């Protein structure tokens, strides 16, 4: 099975992808992660990409497609793929169709995690983590048992991501909607788009996704 998970930053795509990997033995294909790994390993694609990024330019769709092509080859046909946050443009959607066809795979389902923008801002702006072990917390939803002390390691040092602010979140939401709008009709015409309430509790989101996949 091959699926696409769509949703803005903070919608929970990574969490749900990790659960699909655990439950179904699928492979999560995050283009950002693949790009960083390719650069670190100094593969031919990684070397080319690094040269482009060092010049302050965006990596081309062709390089991203080549990364996906290489990953699908390494995976083998028996392993399902989860495309996390990709494709992001109509051109990328067409290129993904081509590379899947090359590997004799079909796209089974596109799942969009729907979120309320104001609630998403609240969710992201309030989050922080332990500077020592990385345990995640939230100002409203998940405080440490002892205020100011990490539950897992006892550290008293915490940190927040600099881009976890309202302006950045709303800008990313606007960008996501602008880019995703032309992608969805590409897949809706095939009848493979499903939407899940991304603001529901994590376990409920997982259950909803599993129910959708069980239909395919």
Regions of interest found by a model, annotated:
Residues 1-216:
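Glycine-rich phosphate-binding loop of ATP-dependent small-molecule kinases
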């Amino acid at each position: 099975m091959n699926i696409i998970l769509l949703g803005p930053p903070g919608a929970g795509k990574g969490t749900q992808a990790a659960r699909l990997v655990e439950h179904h033995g699928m492979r999560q294909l995050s283009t950002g992660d693949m790009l960083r790994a390719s650069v670190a390993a100094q593969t031919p694609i990684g070397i080319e990409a690094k040269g482009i990024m060092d010049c302050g330019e965006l990596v081309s769709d062709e390089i991203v497609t080549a990364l996906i092509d290489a990953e699908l080859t390494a995976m083998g046909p028996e392993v399902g793929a989860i495309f996390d946050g990709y494709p992001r443009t109509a051109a990328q959607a067409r290129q993904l169709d081509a590379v899947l066809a090359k590997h004799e795979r079909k796209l089974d389902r596109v799942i969009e995690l729907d979120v309320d923008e104001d609630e998403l801002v609240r969710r992201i702006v309030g989050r922080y983590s332990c500077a020592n072990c990385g345990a995640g917390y939230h100002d409203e939803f998940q405080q440490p048992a002892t205020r100011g002390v990490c539950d897992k390691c006892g550290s008293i040092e915490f940190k927040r991501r600099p881009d976890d602010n309202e302006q950045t979140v709303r800008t990313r939401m606007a960008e996501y909607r602008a880019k995703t709008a032309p992608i969805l009709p590409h897949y809706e015409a095939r009848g493979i788009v499903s939407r899940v309430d991304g603001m529901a509790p994590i376990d409920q989101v997982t259950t909803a996704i599993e129910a959708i996949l069980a239909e395919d």
